[in-house]
């Protein structure tokens, strides 16, 4: 069996293609807390808030079917964290949850930790003895301009409706 442990950032990036055959998604209860905070935060990007809500629905749809499990943060894990001398942050708590879960599975099972958070990745390399990966992000190379071909009619339409951003241009 393959177990893929996701931190909050990587889970939000993976929301549209999270479920795989013969793979158990593992997350920490800390991640669930962070998702709740993201959903209700006034200062978060609307796309991130949407991804958090969508992820909550995905988890609800798959509750109890064995496709994911949650490692619950507890006082024993806090003792483990203190022993590592890592700073006490949500990232380090998630890493300690991953380490504890990794110790629960069979040695022949595959365990992969996913994070797109650079600081979390550094701490994971110091703590975990497993592959540490990032979720592939959609790349967009912004070069500062778009070349748009318009005929006379389109040009007239463009200049008569300057408030309409028909070409999805970034506004300076």
Regions found by a protein language model. Name each.
Residues 2-112, 118-172:
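Active-site-proximal, substrate-binding regions of enzyme catalytic domains
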